[in-house]
């Protein structure tokens, strides 16, 4: 059953629905920053290609602002991942549908572990409502991306591997 609003005026007519075609993967990284996605493709792509047990998929976040795009992504890609990391510029006010979809799939038994980070320099406490991890860990991951650089992306990749190992123990 679809969860998108059907009342006139409920959809933002300014936002065009972009079809989201992404193959499910073990690790999803969704960001509003193209440069960040480019660096991760280099650093994480090499690292996770070596580990044949894990697949990685990177995606630009903006198509997930549309309610139908967010719902489709949650139902067809997100719920099949082991870990999904979102780095969202604008937080809940820019991505309410996607963040609500996270709560929806989790309430229906999705085992995907979720890490939602601010996409700006400012800490956003509201995003903690969507995280499966404690605030100190979320802040540490936020610092890796806030500071940027190859070394921090390597540290973030190590943390991702550890989070996945811990997830397997607790599932």
State where each predicted segment sits.
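N-terminal basic/disordered segments at the start of proteins
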Residues: 2-47
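A short, well-structured beta->alpha microelement
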Residues: 7-15, 48, 52-76
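Short alpha-helical segments and helix-capping/turn motifs at coil-helix boundaries
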Residues: 11-16, 41-42, 68-71, 96-104
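Flexible, charged surface loops at secondary-structure boundaries
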Residues: 20-24, 51-52, 76-80, 107-109
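Structural motif
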Residues: 29-35, 61-64, 87-90, 118-119
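Cofactor-cradling patches in redox/metallo enzymes
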Residues: 72, 83-102, 114
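Hydrophobic or amphipathic alpha-helical targeting/insertion segments
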Residues: 99-152, 156
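Conserved small/polar residues in nucleotide/adenosyl-binding loops
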Residues: 169-171
